[in-house]
From Swiss-Prot:
Keywords: Chloroplast, Electron transport, Membrane, Photosynthesis, Plastid, Thylakoid, Transmembrane, Transmembrane helix, Transport. This is Cytochrome b6-f complex subunit 4. Component of the cytochrome b6-f complex, which mediates electron transfer between photosystem II (PSII) and photosystem I (PSI), cyclic electron flow around PSI, and state transitions. The 4 large subunits of the cytochrome b6-f complex are cytochrome b6, subunit IV (17 kDa polypeptide, petD), cytochrome f and the Rieske protein, while the 4 small subunits are petG, petL, petM and petN. The complex functions as a dimer. The gene is petD. It is a multi-pass membrane protein. It comes from Chaetosphaeridium globosum. GO terms for molecular function: electron transporter, transferring electrons within cytochrome b6/f complex of photosystem II activity; electron transporter, transferring electrons within the cyclic electron transport pathway of photosynthesis activity; ubiquinol-cytochrome-c reductase activity. HAMAP family: Cytb6_f_subIV (MF_01344).
Length: 160
């Protein structure tokens, strides 16, 4: 399969690029014991210390207190569902909206197969996959911001 293809080291062009240091470097500092024993615990304990420290120093109420007898004016999903919520909200046909929502994971699954002929693992040498990723990220952020706005300005974000 193309995704798990190993570089052809008998290729003279590839060997010349590797000799110049242009290929992916499979060698270097070993993960054991350097990363696993020293760097990872520092990062993990540092993250835990920051989280506990911030929660002790600045205890705040998360959101508004719940009132089961009052329905909010607009019910919004969690922030990570904003882009697909915006798709469902703006597409007039619900079947098309569901198909577009199903297209999100299908599109994510196709990204590794876009440039499977490339022998390098450096993302700067895979311009098509990098462009698809960056464009998808910008569209997801655009839709996510638009989902928090009223429906009449949600697609343009009030800019146009």
């Amino acid at each position: 399969m193309g995704v798990t293809k190993k570089p052809d080291l008998s290729d003279p062009v590839l060997r010349a690029k590797l000799a110049k240091g242009m290929g992916h470097n499979y060698y270097g500092e070993p993960a054991w014991p350097n990363d696993l024993l020293y760097i990872f615990p520092v990062c993990i304990f540092g993250t835990i210390a920051c989280t506990v420290g911030l929660s002790v120093l600045e205890p705040v109420i998360v959101g508004e207190p719940a009132n089961p007898f009052a329905t909010p004016l607009e019910i919004l999903p969690e922030w990570y569902f904003f882009p697909v919520f915006q798709i469902l909200r703006t597409v007039p046909n619900k079947l098309l909206g569901v198909l577009l929502m199903a297209g999100v994971p299908v599109g994510l699954l196709t990204v590794p197969f876009i440039e499977n002929v490339n022998k390098f693992q450096n993302p700067f040498r895979r311009p098509v996959a990098t462009t698809v990723f960056l464009l998808g990220t910008v569209v997801a952020i655009w839709l996510g911001i638009g989902a928090a706005l009223p429906i009449d300005t949600s697609l343009t974000l009030g800019l146009f």
